[in-house]
Regions:
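Bacterial Sec-dependent N-terminal signal peptides
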Residues: 1-23
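Signature for phosphate-centric chemistry
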Residues: 21-148, 152-325, 329-425
Length: 425
């Protein structure tokens, strides 16, 4: 697919609406939204609220996930392929199984040697995000503004950053750009925390996930579609695992060059896709959200990132034309930071696993290239406002404001610092 066609596909994807009352309604309208964190980035879905009179944008701070990628780990491709190949060699595949094996081989071949790498669409996603930044907030990126960009050490993140920066330079060659990817900055860019990580492996989390998975298991019919001998399947196939890997593979195609050419969605009914999504969605919430099953503290994994955002903003506010601070990393940073800030209510505790799907929607929080933008405005009296964009749409915060979705910087900062004070290891 050439660059012109890629850009056309991306622009169409960005134009697609996402608002619906329930996940089932969303998935019925667009089946690819059932793909959890594999959902290809859609871009903004709403118009921005005009700034209060007299306020102009002057600084932008950002943290974004890399764009669409290939799946991570050889098993993601090898387990489905070799499971189906073994069945074929032993005469145990149905006609649907033969068809699926051919598709899986094509998908595996495309990904060969590209473990977790950025796809061409992933690159386009970051070009589009940067282009819209500059179009929506031209004052920030005017003239020889300074752009400070950092990435984690993972190549898909570095390439996401480079695609964004190249787009900036195409639109304004006068920009002064500093960019880096160093272990020096990982304490906030990709913070590790042994204590919080240990809670993710707690017995409580494991039990709730296993119980939920048993309750929502939905692989029997899929196995019957693929294989002609149920006794052989029981003896040779981990049915739950194969179903899950095929669901993930089906979800991942939308971010690759095979989208529109190959699909595995015909393996699943709408209800089966929903049941698989429920399990993925729960996994994200209990691992990175405000969940009693992981101590109600996982969002604090991003305490250093939030402090970096605050401190850099404070220093940039003192400058006449500070430009932008850009950070490129992972879903495992954007998601807990979204919860730490309690954007759109995603920081609320959810105790009942069966209620998670009515309050938490991973495809709206954690798609490929998901990003948070903190856009700063000021007036001639130097009063500073900030608004937060999640996936380029205005987000709400539990902060009183007379100009919502804009918030007074001092109120926002006080809210964040009070949050951080509340964390005790």
């Amino acid at each position: 697919m050439n660059a012109k066609n890629l850009l056309l596909w991306a622009s169409l994807a960005f134009a697609m609406p996402m608002a619906a009352q329930t996940p089932q309604e969303d998935f019925k309208r667009d089946i690819t939204l059932s793909g959890s964190n594999y959902v290809a980035y859609r871009g903004p879905q709403k118009q921005l609220t005009p700034a209060p009179k007299g306020y102009k944008p002057f600084y932008l701070s950002h943290y974004g996930r890399h764009g669409s990628r290939f799946m991570i780990g050889k098993k993601a491709y090898d387990v489905p392929y070799f499971s189906l190949l073994k069945a074929k060699q032993e005469g145990k595949l149905t006609a649907k199984g033969e068809e699926t094996l051919a598709k899986v081989k094509m998908i595996r071949d495309e990904a060969k040697g590209r473990d977790g790498e950025l796809t061409p669409l992933g690159a386009l996603q970051h070009q589009g995000i940067t282009r819209r930044m500059m179009e929506r907030f031209p004052e920030i990126f005017a003239g020889n503004a300074n752009i400070e960009a950092r990435s984690t050490l993972v190549i898909r993140c570095i390439l996401s950053m480079e695609n964004g920066l190249h787009q900036m330079l195409r639109m304004n060659p006068k920009l002064h750009i500093f960019h880096d990817a160093s272990d020096h900055d990982m304490y906030y860019m990709n913070q590790g925390d042994r204590y919080l990580d240990s809670l993710k492996h707690s017995v409580g989390r494991r039990v709730v996930r296993e119980d939920f998975a048993r309750k929502h298991a939905c692989y029997s019919r899929v196995m019957q579609e693929l294989f002609n001998d149920p006794v052989w399947v029981k003896q040779n196939i981990d049915q739950s695992d194969l179903n899950w890997r095929l669901y993930e593979m089906a979800s991942s195609i939308q971010g690759t060059e095979l989208r529109g050419k190959v699909s595995l969605y015909d393996l699943f009914t709408e209800e089966e896709l929903y049941q698989n999504w429920l399990q993925s969605n729960l996994g994200w919430q209990v691992s990175y959200g405000n969940s009693p099953y992981t101590g109600n503290v996982q969002p604090f994994s991003q305490r250093n990132l939030l402090m970096d955002i605050i401190e850099k903003a404070d220093s940039c506010i003192a400058l006449p034309h500070p430009g932008a601070t850009l950070r490129y990393g992972h879903d495992t940073m954007v998601t807990p930071l979204t919860c730490l800030l309690d954007l759109n209510g995603y920081g609320e505790e959810i105790r009942d696993p069966e209620r998670i799907a009515s309050q938490w929607f991973d495809y709206k929080i954690t798609p490929m290239a998901t990003n948070l933008q903190f856009v700063f405005y000021r007036n001639k009296a130097n009063d500073v406002l900030v608004k937060v964009l999640l996936c380029e749409d205005e987000a709400t915060l539990p902060i009183k404001s007379d100009v919502e979705p804009y918030y007074h910087w001092n109120d926002f900062k006080a809210y964040c610092l009070e949050k951080l004070k509340g964390y005790k290891k």
